[in-house]
């Protein structure tokens, strides 16, 4: 029996503009030093850019599609068995899928050079919507790693 107590999940409130919990989480993940208003402005402007470039009417649906295209289905985890460490492919829980997708999109946008953060994030969201870009490549690499190590699936825990 585990001695560690379970982590209590924080309730994330819906964001004010789109009334979406997912966008609120994204805003929180974008935030630096508690500056939420700046983070909100960046995210909202980049969602507007996404809707404009993809000609999608529903902005929340466009954002959700961009996020869904980056969500990984499987990932590899290290498992030590008798002195050897194996990369064991495991299915990813829905909450972690969402968190990883957000993390990868934001990291890709921050890594891009030039332009404002709104433009960089907007472009990365457009790329994710179209199943291209750095964040989507990260997802594909993760899936490729899991596929390569499929032989070790029996080591799941």
Curated annotation (Swiss-Prot):
Pfam families listed in its UniProt record: Ribosomal_S7
HAMAP family from the UniProt entry: Ribosomal_uS7_B
Family from the record: Belongs to the universal ribosomal protein uS7 family.
Gene Ontology CC: small ribosomal subunit
Subunit structure as annotated in this protein's UniProt entry: Part of the 30S ribosomal subunit. Contacts proteins S9 and S11.
PANTHER family: RIBOSOMAL PROTEIN S7
SUPFAM superfamilies assigned: Ribosomal protein S7
Keywords from the named record: Ribonucleoprotein, Ribosomal protein, RNA-binding, rRNA-binding, tRNA-binding
Gene Ontology BP term (one): translation
InterPro entries xrefs: Ribosomal_uS7 (IPR000235), Ribosomal_uS7_bac/org-type (IPR005717), Ribosomal_uS7_CS (IPR020606), Ribosomal_uS7_dom (IPR023798), Ribosomal_uS7_dom_sf (IPR036823)
Described function: One of the primary rRNA binding proteins, it binds directly to 16S rRNA where it nucleates assembly of the head domain of the 30S subunit. Is located at the subunit interface close to the decoding center, probably blocks exit of the E-site tRNA.
Any one GO MF annotation of this record: structural constituent of ribosome
Official protein name in the record: Small ribosomal subunit protein uS7
Gene: rpsG
Record flagged with keyword RNA-binding: yes
Source species of the chain: Borrelia turicatae (strain 91E135)
């Amino acid at each position: 029996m585990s001695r560690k107590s379970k982590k209590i999940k924080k309730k994330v409130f819906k964001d004010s503009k789109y009334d979406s919990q997912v966008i609120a989480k994204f805003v929180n993940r974008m935030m630096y030093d508690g500056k939420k208003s700046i983070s909100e402005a960046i995210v909202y402007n980049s969602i507007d850019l996404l809707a404009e470039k993809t000609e999608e009417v529903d902005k929340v649906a466009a954002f959700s599609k961009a996020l869904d295209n980056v969500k990984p289905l499987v990932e590899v985890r290290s498992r030590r068995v008798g002195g050897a460490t194996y990369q064991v492919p495991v299915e990813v829980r829905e909450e972690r899928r969402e968190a990883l997708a957000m993390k990868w999109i934001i990291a890709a946008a921050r890594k891009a050079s030039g332009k404002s953060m709104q433009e960089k994030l907007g472009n990365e969201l457009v790329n994710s919507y179209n199943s291209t870009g750095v964040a989507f490549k990260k997802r594909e690499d993760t899936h490729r790693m899991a596929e390569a190590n499929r032989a070790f699936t029996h080591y799941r825990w």
